[in-house]
Swiss-Prot record:
It comes from Sulfurovum sp. (strain NBC37-1). The lineage of its organism: Bacteria, Pseudomonadati, Campylobacterota, Epsilonproteobacteria, Campylobacterales. The keyword Cell membrane does not apply. The keyword RNA-binding applies. Belongs to the universal ribosomal protein uS15 family. SUPFAM superfamilies: S15/NS1 RNA-binding domain (SSF47060). Keywords: Ribonucleoprotein, Ribosomal protein, RNA-binding, rRNA-binding. This is Small ribosomal subunit protein uS15. PROSITE patterns: RIBOSOMAL_S15. One of its GO terms (molecular function) is rRNA binding. GO terms for cellular component: cytosolic small ribosomal subunit.
């Protein structure tokens, strides 16, 4: 797994909407983005790791669905998280 507990807690603290918030859309997108970055680096060195490539595609699709939900519900939060994480769409 790419994220240890300290890194995960740091991301949750940064993007949480409240004190005990661990599951808001922003937090989920931020955690998925970190996992996607890790897998992207992994696949640069391990080009034949096809199972990780499929896992990466699954994570990207999940993040895309969450971003679409956020865009439909709160456009301002969508712009904020998109700019903060450097996501294109």
């Amino acid at each position: 797994m790419a994220l240890d507990q300290a890194k995960k807690a740091e991301i949750i603290a940064k993007y949480a909407r409240g004190e005990n918030d661990t599951g808001s859309t922003e937090v989920q997108v931020a955690l998925l983005t970190e996992r996607i970055k890790y897998l992207t680096d992994h696949l640069k060195t391990n080009k034949k790791d096809h199972s990780s490539r499929l896992g990466l595609l699954k994570l990207v699709g999940q993040r895309r669905r969450l971003m679409r939900y956020l865009k439909n519900t709160d456009l301002e939060r969508w712009h904020t998280i998109k700019d903060a994480l450097g996501i294109r769409n």
